[in-house]
UniProtKB/Swiss-Prot annotation:
It is an enzyme of class 3 (hydrolase). It is a multi-pass membrane protein. It holds the Pfam family Abhydrolase_1. This is Mesoderm-specific transcript homolog protein. It is found in: Endoplasmic reticulum membrane. The lineage of its organism: Eukaryota, Metazoa, Chordata, Craniata, Vertebrata. SUPFAM superfamilies: alpha/beta-Hydrolases. The gene is MEST.
Length: 335
């Protein structure tokens, strides 16, 4: 009898917990995205949108040095947006006639359709479409990329090498801290869970919040160059815009695509004759030193490399903007 009473009370307790949890979970899942900070709002207001196959793509396009023919197109990383470039934006406008960046599909202020098969191939086609939209498809383009954007740049380079219809004419390429070699790439635990979680992945994306995001992202920055809480909120606001947290698992399939198309994309880097440079934050846990750098130099012996200070990690353009900009302009002025 005593045991039966205890079981009944336990069942009642769990029912009460469940009844309490349901509205709390419902409220949690409907938390609105954070308001944009003044800086992020200004970034959005100064940008524009164009339409690609019915989808709105956000981009920035600044006119810089008058009389210069040089154009630079910036390709951002995962899971953030074109806002990653804001610390070096003004510096680039002092050297280039046009400075252009976009939010890839599924990122930042661009549309984030779901369900959708996100792919590096589609993102490369969106970059090409943007340049056509701007009337720059026949101009020689300098590409500057980071992380996820490095792989988009590799696909653009492959199309350039193959002389594909509609491809960009690439003048130079500068990569930075991207996992271009699957064998030296070390994705974060949360990334592994989301990309290969199967039925669990959609649940994890819905449960993701600022706390989980910030604790996951902060370790890929150096110990002295970690973002402030307000900077992390800007990143999170970009992800939450248009419910972007719900497509993260789909976007992460790029890691599997890197493995599947390694020969195509690494081969493109190794076989073209244009100037290629790599800016490297050596404390990067995602592309660790020295394994990554040794393989890079072995695979691409003609490429030049800039290694930033020892404490700079995965986001060099945010952690050391002046060092990053100086390294990039040194490369541009070398040919």
């Amino acid at each position: 009898m005593v045991r039966r009473d205890r079981l009944r009370r336990m069942r009642e307790w769990w029912v009460q917990v469940g009844l309490l949890a349901v509205p709390l979970l419902a409220a949690y899942l409907h938390i609105p995205p954070p308001q944009l900070s003044p800086a992020l709002h200004s970034w959005k207001s100064s940008g524009k949108f164009f339409t690609y196959k019915g989808l709105r793509i956000f981009y920035q396009d600044s006119v810089g040095v008058v009389g210069s023919p040089e154009i630079v197109v910036l390709l951002h990383g995962f899971p953030t947006s074109s806002y990653d470039w804001y610390k070096i934006w003004e510096g680039l406008t002092l050297s280039f006639h046009r400075v252009i960046a976009l939010d890839f599909l599924g990122f930042g202020f661009s549309d984030k359709p779901r369900p959708h098969h996100y792919s590096i191939f589609e993102q490369a086609s969106i970059v090409e479409a943007l340049l056509r939209h701007l009337g720059l498809q026949s101009r020689r383009i300098n590409l500057l990329s980071h992380d996820y954007g490095d792989t988009v740049a590799q696909e653009l380079l492959y199309r350039f090498k193959q002389n594909r219809s509609g491809r960009l004419t690439i003048k130079s390429l500068c990569l930075s801290n991207g996992g271009i070699f699957p064998e030296t790439h070390r994705p974060l635990l949360l990334q592994k869970l989301l990309k290969d979680g199967g039925m669990l992945s959609p649940i994890l994306t819905r449960l993701m919040n600022f706390f989980v995001f910030s604790r996951g992202l902060t370790p890929v920055f150096g110990p002295y160059t970690r973002p402030s809480e307000s900077e992390l909120w800007d990143m999170w606001a970009g992800i939450r815009n248009n419910d972007g947290n719900l497509v993260i698992d789909s976007l992460l399939q790029y890691i599997n695509q890197r493995k599947k198309f390694r020969r195509r994309w690494v081969g493109a880097l190794a076989s073209v004759s244009i100037p290629i440079h790599f800016i490297y934050g050596p404390l990067d846990p995602v592309n660790p030193y020295p394994e990554f750098l040794e393989l890079y130099r072995k695979t691409l012996p003609r490429s030049t490399v800039s290694i930033l200070d020892d404490h700079i990690s995965h986001y060099p353009q945010l952690e050391d903007p002046m060092g990053f900009l100086n390294a990039y302009m040194g490369f541009i002025n070398s040919f």
